[in-house]
């Protein structure tokens, strides 16, 4: 063994008979780690590392059993240590031998070279090393000879197996060659058998197909009943393909099956289309929850436009659908439970059936009919939910009613329920059509069919019908006349060739005008029903007869009769020829209830419109512009005009409102509150629609009309009654005296206006100036009874005119609101882009309820000027009415005093006996002043009452003193009559004007009773001493100033000095009193008496003048 392995030491270097267990590379490495291919390495400390033999040789079993841990060293044998030492020695002594490029011949030559450069002297060491290496190898062999022996035996067995396999493969190749040669040999019998076998296979396949076709009807019906339509289409098409095979053409028994399957193909398409209609138009019970939740969202107008928590967002549903993959059926779930999934499944089934385009055409054709059915059903459902007796029927007002809060709330509930339900259904239908659109679009994209506009154009048709239905709703519930505006230019039904209505088509009667509860109608209906039941039994249901007696008749309690659905535009007029029942009476005020839900619906519809479609979302509200300008605005103008005419024309429009305390602090006209109610209602309604100056202008126009009406009423109050006479009387002279002073520019009017505008209504300077001007004005004309307002109701109406105008001015001023939106449809024939955008400004649907929201009238800077001017007109009319009231009591006093002082109209003041009763004119004046004051207190505020009251005593005092000469001639008993009249007036005035008395006038006439000497004594005592020279000037010029009615410094000084002093009189006043003292003598028929009296009077007047000038 040692010789065998020793002959080739290098072939087994480092293997030890066990292979290359210690190598890290696949190529043989004879040296180790120290060199690129060195097997042993070049460690400088051989004792610190195991030997190469120990690393390459497998550990002995004893060493494997002796492992005590992961860090224990392998126990080496003596042979392994010996070979390691040899290797270390070679590396140390003969390093060239371990190099990869070692040349043994070169080393051998060096060992044989005995020269100084040779290594012959190391030859013995080389031999010893070689001998040491041989012994080490032998020891290794001896230690591992059993492993070597077993390896040799195993090698021979493997070699034998390989040789045996080679022999078998060679024999197999020879057999295959022989088989190939045998198969190439021709055999007619085998060929005949093969043909017969193929024929039998065909017959068996045909029989199997016939057996499969026999079960197709049952399978098809089962799949259709389970609504697994994809499987049903697949079964049907597979069966039809089988029947189209040529080998089955001659089988006559299949003709019935062919006919059946052909019919089933059409029937299946009809079923699929019907199923689509069931889910697109919400007929399926599985669709109810979706549209009901959407209806709730439509009803929440004061919240966001987003989806409610109970409704899955539609865009989220679209995102969850994988349009890139064709839909697949799930037998484990009900396909109808998910409407959108079911629609895509039906579209896929129709496409696989090859009838998708036909189905889309059928959907488009039936779309108007289906929508009409949805709207009609919704109206009927809402009609049953809300009793007609609670929502108000047709009252013959033609939409001119302004309902109270309760009626408005009930009508709003009806419209709210109708629109929320209808728009909820419309939105659900639109979502279904969007899913249908997306399913067809994805189908076309997957099949690469391009952009098929025929299949994808249905959404625009849906929108056109939606637009018509919305327009019809707005038209039915806003306009009171069906012919106010025609949305279609086509002739209306019943119109002749000349455009006139065909009289033959006129309705002779209307069911809405029939009283369904009358006994005559009930008996007629019973007779008709019995005839029908006798002629066609079963046609009418006897169990429902009692409950449906009036089903053929629309009761009178129902609102306005059914109105035609607006089948306007795009070919829908013929299909949409049915009628809708109006649930509430049409009125422009319904616009505030109709428009916000409509805008919410349109806002939500924008998110449903498929992107890239031929329907631009920005144009969804364009039809509302047309409706607003061409329908709503004329209807608003007409309704507003009619309502105003109703307010103006009411018999009690200018009567006191019985419920004035609920709206004002003082009584106002009933017509004024009604007019403001109209204005408020319209402003509230305008607040719910986009701003349009044309609409605001309509309201301002009615305000102007109301001013004109009130001003006409004022003129009617102050115009004299014509009792014949000259008809050519001037317009100015038709008015009563107080109205002339209150309306025409004059100093009296200016003074009174200054007094009213001053903070102190007791300004003595203005009061005495007014008194002097009024006396001067009255002395320049003769007042008669026609100059005075005799009717107390007219006085009260004048007070109400003032309070009404002031109240209306304040209330309307609260409506003032300036907006930056200057849209004015009246200035343009066609809607501009700005006008189309105005609907987007209404993003706050909280205005729909509007009950608690502030009401205002939006106006531009231009429009507000007209608004402010009408408010000024209201204030001016109120001021005119107040001035008229102020002057009326004064003209009445002046007229009564003129009558009482004039001896020509009443008894003379030359009396033979004392008078114990005041003059009837004075008593009449007292009663009129008391009644006048009562009316003022009842109707006006305290400031206005004081404005009218203040100065009455001063006016009576002044007039009695200034016009004392009117009573001439007068004696002592006549003066007593005057004193009695003054006393009666004073007692009465104390109940009207606070702190008033007529002592000055009483003192004045008391000096008459004492005589001329007493007058002079008064003057001598300096009664008028403070008047000085100015008083004398005033005395000489007062007549001219009084007659001209002009205010001079002297007259003002006289007013200041003598106006408020009970015992001081001016020169003119004392002079007139002296003349009055001699009036009886001057009137004596004897000339001597009169001449003597005149001389005495001249002397007394001279003395009076001297006293006055000396003072």
Swiss-Prot record:
It comes from Neurospora crassa (strain ATCC 24698 / 74-OR23-1A / CBS 708.71 / DSM 1257 / FGSC 987). Component of the exocyst complex involved in the docking of exocytic vesicles with fusion sites on the plasma membrane. Pfam families: Sec8_C, Sec8_N. Residues 1-79, 1023-1057 are annotated as: Disordered. The keyword rRNA-binding does not apply. Residues 31-41 have a biased composition (Low complexity). Residues 42-55 have a biased composition (Polar residues). Belongs to the SEC8 family. One of its GO terms (cellular component) is exocyst. PANTHER family: EXOCYST COMPLEX COMPONENT 4. The exocyst complex is composed of sec3, sec5, sec6, sec8, sec10, sec15, exo70 and exo84. Signal peptide: none annotated. GO terms for biological process: exocytosis; Golgi to plasma membrane transport; protein transport; vesicle docking involved in exocytosis; vesicle tethering involved in exocytosis. This is Probable exocyst complex component sec8. Keywords: Exocytosis, Protein transport, Transport.
């Amino acid at each position: 063994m040692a010789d065998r392995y020793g002959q080739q030491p290098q072939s087994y270097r480092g293997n030890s008979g066990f292979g290359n267990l210690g190598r890290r590379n696949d190529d043989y490495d004879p040296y180790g780690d120290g060199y690129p291919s060195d097997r042993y390495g070049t460690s400088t400390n051989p004792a610190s590392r195991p030997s190469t033999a120990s690393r390459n040789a497998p550990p002995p079993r004893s060493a494997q059993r002796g492992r005590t841990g992961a860090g224990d060293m392998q126990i080496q044998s003596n042979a392994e240590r010996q070979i390691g030492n040899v290797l270390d020695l070679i590396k140390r002594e003969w390093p060239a031998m371990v190099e990869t490029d070692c040349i043994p011949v070169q080393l051998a030559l060096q060992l044989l070279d005995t020269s100084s450069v040779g290594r012959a002297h190391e030859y013995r060491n080389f031999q010893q090393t070689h001998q040491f290496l041989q012994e080490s190898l032998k020891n290794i062999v001896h230690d591992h000879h059993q492993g070597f022996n077993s390896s040799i035996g195993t090698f021979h067995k493997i070699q034998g197996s390989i040789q045996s396999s080679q022999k078998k493969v060679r024999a197999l190749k020879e057999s295959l060659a022989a088989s190939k040669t045998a198969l190439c040999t021709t055999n007619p019998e085998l060929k005949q058998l093969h043909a017969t076998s193929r024929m039998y296979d065909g017959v068996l396949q045909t029989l199997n197909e016939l057996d499969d076709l026999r079960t197709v009807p049952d399978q098809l019906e089962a799949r259709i009943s389970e609504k697994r339509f994809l499987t049903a289409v697949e079964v049907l098409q597979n069966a039809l393909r089988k029947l189209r095979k040529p080998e089955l053409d001659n089988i006559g028994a299949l003709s019935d099956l062919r006919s059946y399957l052909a019919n089933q193909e059409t029937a299946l398409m009809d079923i699929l289309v019907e199923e689509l209609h069931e889910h697109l138009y919400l007929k399926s019970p599985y669709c109810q929850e979706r549209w009901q939740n959407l209806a709730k969202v439509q009803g929440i107008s004061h919240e966001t436009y987003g989806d409610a928590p109970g409704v899955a967002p539609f865009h989220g549903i679209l995102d969850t659908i994988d349009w890139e993959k064709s839909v697949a059926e799930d037998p484990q779930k009900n396909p109808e439970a998910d409407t959108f999934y079911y629609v895509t499944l039906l579209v896929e089934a129709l496409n696989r059936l090859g009838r998708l385009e036909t189905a889309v055409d059928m959907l488009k054709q039936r779309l108007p009919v289906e929508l009409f059915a949805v709207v009609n059903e919704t109206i009927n459902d809402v009609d049953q939910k809300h009793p007609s007796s609670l929502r108000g029927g047709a009252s013959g007002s033609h939409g001119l009613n302004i309902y109270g809060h309760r009626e408005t709330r009930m009508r709003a509930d009806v419209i709210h329920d109708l629109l929320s339900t209808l728009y909820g259904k419309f939105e659900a239908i639109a979502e279904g059509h969007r899913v249908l659109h997306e399913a067809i679009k994805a189908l076309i994209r997957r099949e690469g069919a391009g952009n098929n506009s025929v299949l994808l154009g249905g959404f625009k048709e849906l929108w056109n019908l939606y637009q018509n239905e919305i327009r019809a709703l707005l038209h039915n519930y806003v306009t009171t006349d069906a012919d106010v505006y025609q949305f279609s230019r086509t002739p209306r039904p019943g119109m002749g060739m000349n455009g006139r209505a065909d009289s033959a088509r006129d309705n002779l009667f209307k069911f809405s005008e029939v009283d369904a509860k009358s006994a005559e109608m009930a008996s007629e209906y019973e007779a008709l029903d019995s005839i029908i039941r006798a002629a066609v039994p079963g046609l009418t249901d006897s169990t429902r007869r009692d409950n449906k007696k009036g089903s053929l008749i629309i009761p009178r309690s129902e609102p306005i009769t059914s109105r035609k659905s607006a089948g306007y535009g795009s070919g829908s007029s013929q299909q949409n020829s049915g009628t809708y029942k109006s649930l509430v009476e049409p009125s422009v005020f319904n616009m505030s209830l109709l428009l916000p839900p409509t805008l919410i619906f349109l806002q939500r519809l924008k998110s449903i419109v498929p992107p890239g479609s031929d329907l631009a979302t920005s144009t969804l509200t364009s039809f509302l512009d047309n409706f607003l300008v061409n329908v709503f605005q004329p209807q608003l103008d007409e309704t507003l005009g009619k309502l105003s005419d109703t307010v103006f024309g009411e018999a009690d429009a200018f009567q006191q409102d019985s419920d004035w305390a609920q709206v004002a602090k003082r009584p106002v006209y009933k017509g004024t509150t009604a007019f403001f109610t109209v204005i408020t209602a319209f402003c509230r309604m305008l607040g719910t629609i986009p701003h349009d100056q044309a609409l605001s202008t309509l309201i301002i126009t009615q305000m102007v009309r109301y001013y004109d009406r009130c001003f006409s009423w004022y003129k009617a109050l102050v115009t004299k009654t014509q009792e014949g006479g000259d008809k050519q009387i001037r317009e100015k002279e038709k008015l009563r005296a107080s109205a002339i002073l209150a309306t025409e520019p004059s100093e009296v009017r200016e003074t009174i206006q200054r007094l009213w505008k001053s903070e102190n209504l007791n300004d003595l300077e203005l009061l005495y100036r007014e008194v002097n001007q009024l006396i001067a004005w009255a002395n320049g004309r003769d007042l008669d009874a026609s100059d005075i307002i005799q009717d107390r109701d007219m006085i009260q109406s004048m007070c109400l005119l003032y309070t009404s105008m002031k109240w209306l001015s304040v209330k309307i001023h609260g409506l003032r609101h300036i907006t930056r939106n200057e849209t004015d449809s009246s200035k343009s024939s066609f809607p501009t882009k700005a006008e189309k955008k105005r609907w987007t400004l209404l993003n706050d649907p909280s205005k729909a309820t509007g009950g608690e929201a502030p009401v205002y009238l939006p106006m531009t800077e231009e429009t507000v000027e007209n608004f402010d001017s009408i408010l000024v007109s209201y204030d001016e009319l109120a001021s005119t009415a107040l001035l008229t009231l102020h002057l009326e009591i004064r003209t009445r006093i002046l007229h009564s005093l003129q009558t009482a002082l004039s001896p020509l109209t009443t008894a003379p003041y030359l009396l033979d006996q004392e008078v114990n009763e005041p003059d009837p004119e004075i008593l009449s004046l007292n009663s009129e002043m008391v009644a006048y004051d009562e009316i003022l207190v009842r109707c006006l505020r305290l400031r206005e009452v004081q404005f009218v009251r203040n100065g009455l005593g001063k006016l009576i005092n002044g007039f009695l003193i200034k016009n004392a000469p009117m009573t001439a001639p007068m004696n002592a008993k006549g003066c007593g009559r005057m004193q009695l009249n003054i006393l009666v007036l004073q007692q009465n005035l104390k109940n009207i004007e606070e702190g008033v008395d007529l002592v000055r006038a009483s003192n004045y006439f008391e000096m008459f009773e004492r005589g001329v000497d007493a007058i002079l004594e008064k003057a001598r005592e300096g009664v008028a001493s403070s008047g000085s020279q100015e008083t004398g000037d005033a005395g000489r010029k007062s007549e001219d100033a009084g007659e001209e009615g002009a205010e001079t410094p002297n007259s003002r000084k006289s007013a200041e000095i003598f106006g408020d002093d009970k015992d001081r009189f001016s020169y003119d006043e004392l002079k007139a009193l002296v003349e009055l003292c001699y009036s009886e003598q001057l009137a004596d028929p004897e000339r001597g008496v009169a001449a003597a009296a005149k001389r005495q009077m001249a002397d007394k007047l001279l003395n009076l003048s001297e006293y006055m000038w000396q003072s």
